[in-house]
Amino acid sequence: MLCLAGAIIPAVWASATEVVLKDGRVLRGKLGEVAGLAEIPQPNSPDGEGPSPSILLMDDDLSRTFVSKRLIKEVRQEETGHGEEKFSLHQSVKRNGLTIRSVGPAMRVQPFDEFGRRIYTMYTGKGPVDVIQGITDLTPRWAKVEGITHVWDMRIATSSIPREELQKILLKQINTKDVESYKKIARFYLQGERYAEARQALDDLMKAFPERKDLQEQLAPSIRAIKQLSAQQLLAELRLRRDAGQHGLVWDVLKKFPSDEIGGEILQGAGDMLKDYETKAARRVKVLEKMDALLPKITDNYQREELQKIRDEMAAELSINNMDRMAAFLQNADDAQMPAQAKLALAVSGWLLGSDSAIDQLPVALSIYGIRRQLREYLIEPVKIKREAILDGLKSQEGSSPGLIADLLSHMKPQADPPEVVSPERPGYYKLEVPGLPKEPPITYWVQLPPEYDPYKLYPAIVTMNGAGNTAESQIDWWAGDWVNPRRASEKNEDASNPPVPDEKKPDEKKSDEKKSAEKAPAVPMTRNGHAARYGYIVIAPQWSVEHQKKYNYSAREHAAVLNSLRDACRRFSIDTDRVYLSGYSMGGDAVWDIGLAHPDLWAGVIPISALADRYCNFYWENAKYVPFYVVLGEFDGSKLTKDALDLDRYLKYGYNATTIEYQGRGHDNFHEEILRIFDWMGRFRRNFFPREFTCSTMRDWDCFFWWVELDGLPPKSQVDPEHWPPPAGSRAAQVKGKITGNNINVFAGSAQVSIWLSPQMVDFKQRVSIVVNGQQIYAKEPFLQGDPRTILEDVRTRADRQHPFWTRLDNSTGRARGK
């Protein structure tokens, strides 16, 4: 009988260890400790002499993961049990002679043949080099690929091998006359959580031995177990899609959720989700029906007309994502003692401000509706004098307090409408332009929205930067996946109730297939099945590099391309500004390392891939304390790890939340197989926009804003422009420090001017606030701080952060010398 016990337990290795980190991640593999990333792991000295290693190393045979030991919550040995299925392939491996020690960008990689061989063509300084490779070890998680013409040990994720290629390789490795060989393939797929392939392997087994009538009965328990695992996997996928806001897809699949031989707990979970959707749909109908019944009871014509507009807006935009706004209205909708005006006021104010802020005074609720309209007009008006007129009208409105304005802004849709999509066949895909620096051309950037995008739901976002020879659009493809025809995708998917889950085949490896499919496909809306779509992320890709650019220049133009694109996207799309992640590949990775450290207040995490930390990064390294880093690189990508170790070692020594992944035997790659772990990592971190204390470094006049402190005029010895690099002897970064203790704010800044931006999320405006800059008190008087509508609106108009608007600003001249 097929043994499932070893298939569903975690994979095990010799001396396997499981490390639980404080952020909830679990690392598995062989445990080691190092004092620095560039050193070779050594066993601890028996007498305890030598430096105590501060860095944890986990080796899982595919990659090595480095984190600070300060991030560890628990270390435990895994229980011994059934190990992974492994297929060992015979190859004529080269053991000496020409040796690969540095791997540049791949020019062409052929598919694996049935014997597990392929030709890998890489670019070198002497031109293209062809290397014949062969898989020697194949497990459910990783494959060892060795050189046949050159000495080379490379590791790749098994998930990156296309299904068809993998199946051919496996079938070539078994004795097709042996029942146990087919079972081994089934166990292999089970351990890789590839349940459809595991089921197919058992079907192939029964077809290969039609004379074995006992096989069907013998395999029945295993087939039932696979059905359970498949249903469990499907339910987990549906929960993921639900959390991503893809309610239409989830609801449709739940209606046809498989029930044959599925356990009660799984069916109950699916049934509860379906019931919840049906309940929310019924609530939506009830809200509109109740409003329709109440509207005729309003005798004032103006009020009735305004209410009808709001009712029509709600009919178009009320959804599962904002249904909670109607809680107060629904609780009182059937109260015979409450007047119609009060009930409608609850509906209107709940719609505008959320149920917790709902009120029962209809004139006030309608006034709030008018204020929201004025806020939107102000935010999209490009002419200053017209904005001032709108602001004057807003101030004349009764109740237009700073608190109300901030509350309305946080519940509004984005202020600017997006343009038309690139093509009707590519929903949610936009090409936009935003002004660059003065005298510079406008910046083009691309945006891909997730399926079923709703402007009332806040979405996490990825800002991604391309490498040399790549485009912004290719970065969108890396994160969101290629375009596919949904009809063709559903035809390939055996279980129509199962939402497609992409494999880890690289986007650039699918381009030719995509082009052929697009030529044959009818003009119907296509879809992306990449992981950004599954997890519900908005992807933003600025075209930041110029034609033929080969390296990152650390310039103001490049920073502006990223920051201006992000702000413009936040004006147009519903982006959760506390969950914006900055990513980049190759020279784009160099850029995000620099930009992430220069502006740590903007990002929930920074993801440099095949990147180099250079120039300003070496001076800004302490800024990494405030933003998590996830660095991915290849063992044979030149000397990158050795160079990056200068900064990474400092991050890890001081316990910063920095993770480094080194793929074994790999070179200058984009490491698409790491994407699932990256999404898991991103899901664990949010930006803290109001830290109680920070100390950051800066050397450029555009690296001037840190959370709630803005600088102007760096000292001469601290300001070094990129065209004057390297800095002259004696140059040092300027420091800015901020600390909030209760209602006391203390700032130290080595600049000529300091501006402090304030919000009730930082200090209590109803209590006395004390502000000290460079040891001098600049504010500690009555009356208390007051919010200013102009400050709030200008802050949101320029920064486009509706979640954290600043309410007021204090400027102070420090008397320090300015730079050039």
Label for each model-derived stretch:
Residues 1-11:
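Bacterial N-terminal signal peptides
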Residues 13-317, 787-819:
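Compositionally biased alpha-helical segments
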Residues 274-459, 788, 792-795, 801:
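A domain-start/cap signature at the N-terminus of enzymes
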Residues 458-461, 465-571:
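Active-site machinery of serine-nucleophile hydrolases
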Residues 571, 578-625:
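Primarily recognizes the serine-hydrolase "nucleophile elbow" in alpha/beta-hydrolase
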Residues 624, 630-633:
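Short beta-strand/loop motif that positions the catalytic acidic residue
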Residues 638, 642-746, 750-751, 789:
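C-terminal catalytic histidine-bearing segment of alpha/beta-hydrolase fold enzymes
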Residues 702-820:
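C-terminal beta-sandwich/jelly-roll accessory domains of carbohydrate-active enzymes
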